[in-house]
Swiss-Prot record:
Binding site for [4Fe-4S] cluster: C302, C362, C365
PROSITE patterns, per database record: ACONITASE_1, ACONITASE_2
Family classification: Belongs to the aconitase/IPM isomerase family. LeuC type 2 subfamily.
This protein's UniProt keywords: 4Fe-4S, Amino-acid biosynthesis, Branched-chain amino acid biosynthesis, Iron, Iron-sulfur, Leucine biosynthesis, Lyase, Metal-binding
Species this protein is from: Campylobacter concisus (strain 13826)
Functional description taken from the UniProt entry: Catalyzes the isomerization between 2-isopropylmalate and 3-isopropylmalate, via the formation of 2-isopropylmaleate.
Biochemical pathway: Amino-acid biosynthesis; L-leucine biosynthesis; L-leucine from 3-methyl-2-oxobutanoate: step 2/4
EC number assigned by the record: 4.2.1.33
Name under which the protein is recorded: 3-isopropylmalate dehydratase large subunit
Gene behind this protein: leuC
Biological process annotations from GO: L-leucine biosynthetic process
GO molecular function: 3-isopropylmalate dehydratase activity; 4 iron, 4 sulfur cluster binding; metal ion binding
HAMAP family named in the record: LeuC_type2 (MF_01027)
Length: 421
């Protein structure tokens, strides 16, 4: 039987050939929880009477949403995960001493391996498919079941193959490719499907761009996003202390897809997702014509808080100043990224431009803290969601864009095209 990469990964984990639509129970290689979702899983774990984790080395808790804690409620919530991690002597526990957003720090630490089946109690767990793994978000109760048994059930998803052709223009990145897909198919256009990204454009993308694309697969309703391993993937993995030996799977020629989409990127401009859906994509040229003044610009999150994003922003901000009526917040996705940015002089560039540089956190993205929007404020952001009230007041607006667009807009005080600078 001809199989997709997703079908092959599940076949490997189940021990028999499986195809899309089958209900299976699969071994889980890595379980991911955070300070918001893990306490619920811990409660269910303890309620079950379980005394130990099925696979302690395959469970990671990443404290990233409200860390350092912002108030008493978040402090007490974090305490639950901390005590559980210490009680079970978790090796893969990441807190203030080694901070990072979960979907950035796990690949950085070598905890995501090609061929894995990964689940996380966070919808953007699909990020890790960029490394040729099947990775998806689940609820906290599902997480608890996997903590106890080391397994979980799935319906093997059908796949949509997206083939990118052409050549990217300057300041067009992986973020723009995924926003363009979502613009074309809508927020439910890939419902419970595996979005498989391929083509000559993907072959030339950095890992950071690939992570951005897979991260936002869920915004099209997808169960996962996935990119087959190539030399760029292998180079990324080369110096990592990998948890286990990787397995490389590739879709067969003639494998069955729900649909195959071909996108020519030759004339693609940077894409801006207008409020209040990621599918509301428009060209940056349209946004410039709309003359949209901004109160806040944000660069960070599990979508675009990586080192390449900071380098892009620094190139644009160097020697410039953030507009007087605009705030620019920059949040490196991990401590390692922050330290690398500091060594390269990027942090100095940001501060001299008038930006605020924060510790790694999900805070602003989910409207938790460190960048909440007030009534009727407008923000251009590298994050992944722009729903009503996502980053603050329900009357505020979020425009999603790549790091270059956000940096250029911070200087202009309104949404700007970095190619015009």
């Amino acid at each position: 039987m001809k199989q997709t990469i997703t079908e092959k990964i599940f076949s490997d984990h189940v021990g028999k050939e499986v195809s899309a639509g089958e209900i299976i129970e699969s071994k889980i290689d890595m379980i991911i929880g955070n300070d918001i979702t893990t306490p619920i899983s811990i409660k269910q774990f303890e309620r079950s009477g379980a005394k130990k984790l099925a696979n302690p080395d395959g469970f990671a808790i990443v404290m990233d949403h409200y860390i350092p804690t912002k108030d008493i409620l978040s402090a007490n919530q974090a305490k639950i995960s901390r005590e559980f991690a210490y009680k079970h002597d978790l090796k893969n526990y990441f807190d203030e001493k080694d901070m990072g957003i979960e979907h950035a720090i796990l690949p950085e630490k070598g905890l995501v391996i090609p061929g894995d089946v990964i689940i996380g109690a966070d919808s953007h767990t699909c990020t890790h498919g960029a490394l040729g793994a099947f990775s998806t978000g689940m609820g906290s109760t599902d997480l608890a079941y996997a903590m106890i048994t080391g397994k979980n059930w799935f319906k093997v998803p059908e796949s949509i193959k997206v083939v990118f052709k052409g050549k990217l223009d300057k300041h067009v990145y992986g973020k723009d490719l995924i926003l363009e897909i979502i613009r074309q198919i809508g927020v439910d256009g890939a419902l419970y499907k595996a979005l498989e990204f391929s083509g000559e454009v993907i072959d030339g993308l950095s890992m950071d761009d690939r992570f951005s694309m897979c991260n936002m697969a869920i915004e099209a309703g997808a169960k996962s996003g996935i990119i087959a391993v190539d030399e760029i993937t292998k180079e990324f993995l080369k110096d990592k202390n990998l948890r286990d030996k990787p397995k490389f799977f590739y879709s067969d020629e003639g494998a069955k897809y729900d649909k195959i989409l071909e996108i020519d990127v030759t004339n693609l401009d940077p894409v801006i997702a207008y409020p209040f859906l990621p599918s509301n994509g428009k060209s940056v040229r349209q946004a410039v014509r709309d003359d949209l003044a901004i109160d806040q610009a944000f660069i960070g999150s599990c979508t675009n808080g990586r080192l390449s994003d900071l380098r892009i922003a620094a190139q644009i901000l160097k020697g410039k100043k953030v507009a007087r009526k605009t705030r620019l917040i920059i949040t490196p996705a991990t401590q390692k990224i922050a330290r690398a940015a500091e060594k390269e002089g990027l942090i100095d560039i940001f501060i001299e431009a008038g930006a605020v540089v924060s510790n790694p956190t999900c805070g602003a993205c989910l409207g938790g803290y460190m960048g909440i929007l007030g009534a009727n404020e407008r923000c251009i952001s590298t994050t992944n969601r722009n729903f009503v009230g996502r980053m603050g007041d329900r009357t505020s607006e979020i425009y999603l864009a790549n790091s270059a667009v956000v940096a250029a807009s911070a200087i202009a005080g309104k949404i700007a095209d970095p190619r015009d600078l």
